[in-house]
């Protein structure tokens, strides 16, 4: 794909706007963490522009004032040009608050118990219709940006844009298209929970991509099984990780990402106020994650209490570091309440202020907590990858052990170098906490060195290159395969969205 022009898109931007009180004009600032920042750094590596959604009224106003985009400097020092799409506010609100943050997130992350939820009413159909309009906005913006390009390459990121590849393929049938999904893909049986038009429509939107990427092998396998289960006219090759469907050939690829070296180097870590004094003279156990049920802090706290009952945790404190995220989603707000309850009960049993919650979105605070920790817990119930599991061992200064969920995407890379646990088993997690804190200095140092060596190769730059190399190879294979379908009737996927 030498000489090709690359076009990058994701729903979430790394920048957002508020109003400058002095001037009344929109003021840009870098949003913390998340997929948006990962994609932004990718744009910086490739030195290309990036299309994303305007999330707020201030974002929309800034977009109207800057139709050609805004240049921002990232934490790594790289500069990017971002152009924000202005969606119909009602459409965007429904897609943001219901369709993606609630319905699609729950479907991909096993958020429903199936006994009591979900029940799909007319709101699901309305959300799906708005999702189609939202998807069309993105496809139109990408196609407009690439209209003058003879040889465009499209990099489309995350689950909110799963319908975009089909619409791009209709207009640019020969273009290389990569869709990278940053979250898990559930089992085929779980995917069947969704209404028929949604569960198949999403697959129809994705399969025209040349390459579909996930962070872990298990998500690729689950996706292939969903296709095999729901699309009887698809030909699945599980060894080659390919799908042939209605003239399309799609390759599934696992492309792990760990961290951005420049971003880590560009941080200024500082512990949150009061934490240094509180932790002084104590071993510190740190659990870190968003205010999202998948991050599983409640069970981590309860496992810590179990471990303490067994002895050996004297002079040990636990910090639950939570980053506020999507608290308008009922499941997230309920999760925060459950964590607070677990912490209160832990302190009632173990002594006041043994366990603390620290709740903000300052990444420098998070990095500083990683550095100070004597034990790190990442026990997600499920996770597409979890970059913190790579970042924390690399910045830690105390040879902290790591407890890592076996259902986290990162476990495929780091599992053998961490204490791998079933995230639902409190006893196993308690035993892992006790064993980690009982380990001697030499054992800890040797394990930490092996863990750092395992994490270090998985840089942002390597991940970006893996996308480009994989897409180039898959585009060549797809082109060869397409010749076999020259006589097949054309099938439009427009109606699927």
UniProtKB/Swiss-Prot annotation:
Record: residues binding validamine 7-phosphate: 182, 383-386
GO MF annotation, one: alpha,alpha-trehalose-phosphate synthase (UDP-forming) activity
Keyword Transferase: yes
Matches recorded under InterPro entries: Glyco_trans_20
Enzyme class: transferase
Record keyword Transport present: no
SUPFAM superfamilies the UniProt entry points to: UDP-Glycosyltransferase/glycogen phosphorylase (SSF53756)
Catalytic reactions of this protein: validamine 7-phosphate + GDP-valienol = validoxylamine A 7'-phosphate + GDP + H(+)
Binding residues for GDP-valienol: 158, 290, 295, 321, 325-326, 361-362, 366, 387-388, 391
Protein keywords: Antibiotic biosynthesis, Transferase
One Pfam family hit: Glyco_transf_20
Summary of the function given for this chain in its UniProt record: Involved in the biosynthesis of the antifungal agent validamycin A. Catalyzes the condensation between GDP-valienol and validamine 7-phosphate via a nonglycosidic C-N bond formation to yield validoxylamine A 7'-phosphate.
Recorded family membership: Belongs to the glycosyltransferase 20 family.
Subunit (UniProt): Homodimer.
Name of the featured protein: Validamine 7-phosphate valienyltransferase
């Amino acid at each position: 794909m030498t000489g090709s022009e690359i076009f990058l898109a994701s729903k979430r931007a790394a920048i957002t706007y508020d109003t400058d009180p002095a001037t009344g004009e929109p003021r840009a600032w870098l949003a913390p963490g998340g997929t948006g920042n990962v994609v932004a750094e990718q744009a910086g590596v490739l030195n290309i522009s990036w299309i994303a959604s305007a999330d707020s009224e201030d974002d929309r106003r800034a977009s109207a004032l800057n139709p050609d985009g805004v240049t921002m400097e990232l934490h790594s020092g790289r500069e990017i040009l971002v152009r924000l799409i202005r969606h119909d506010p009602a459409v965007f609100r429904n897609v943001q608050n219901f369709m993606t943050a609630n319905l699609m997130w729950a479907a991909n992350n096993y958020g429903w118990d199936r006994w009591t939820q979900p029940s799909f009413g007319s709101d699901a159909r309305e959300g799906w219709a708005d999702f189609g309009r939202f998807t069309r906005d993105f496809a139109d913006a990408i196609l407009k940006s690439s209209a003058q390009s003879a040889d465009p390459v499209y990099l489309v990121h995350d689950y909110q844009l799963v319908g975009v590849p089909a619409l791009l393929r209709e207009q640019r049938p020969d273009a290389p298209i990569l869709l990278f999904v940053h979250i898990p893909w559930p089992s085929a049986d779980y995917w069947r929970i969704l209404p028929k038009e949604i569960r198949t429509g999403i697959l129809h939107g994705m399969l025209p991509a040349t390459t579909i990427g996930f962070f872990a092998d298990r998500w690729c396998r689950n996706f292939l099984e969903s296709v095999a289960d729901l699309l009887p006219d698809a030909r699945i090759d599980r060894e080659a990780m390919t799908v042939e469907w209605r003239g399309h050939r799609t390759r599934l690829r696992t492309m792990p990402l760990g961290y951005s070296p420049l971003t880590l180097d560009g941080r200024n870590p500082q512990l949150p106020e009061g934490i240094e004094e509180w932790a002084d003279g104590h071993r510190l156990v740190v659990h870190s994650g968003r205010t999202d049920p998948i991050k599983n802090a409640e069970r981590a706290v309860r496992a810590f209490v179990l471990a303490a009952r067994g002895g050996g945790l004297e002079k040990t404190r636990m910090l639950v570091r939570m980053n506020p995220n999507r608290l308008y989603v009922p499941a997230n707000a309920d999760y925060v309440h459950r964590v607070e309850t677990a912490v209160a009960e832990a302190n009632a049993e173990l002594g006041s202020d043994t366990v603390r919650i620290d709740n903000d979105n300052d990444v420098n605070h998070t990095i500083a907590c990683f550095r100070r920790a004597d034990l790190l817990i990442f026990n997600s119930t499920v996770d597409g990858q979890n970059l913190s599991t790579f970042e924390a061992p690399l910045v830690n200064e105390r040879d902290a052990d790591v407890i890592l969920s076996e259902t986290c995407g990162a476990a495929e890379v780091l599992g053998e170098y961490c204490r791998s646990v079933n995230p639902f088993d409190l006893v196993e997690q308690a035993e892992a906490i006790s064993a980690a804190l009982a380990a001697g200095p030499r054992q800890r140092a040797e394990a930490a060195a092996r863990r750092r060596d395992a994490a270090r190769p998985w840089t942002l730059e390597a991940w970006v290159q893996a996308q480009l190399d994989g897409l180039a190879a898959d585009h060549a294979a797809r082109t060869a395969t397409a010749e076999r379908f020259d006589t097949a009737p054309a099938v439009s996927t427009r109606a699927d969205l």
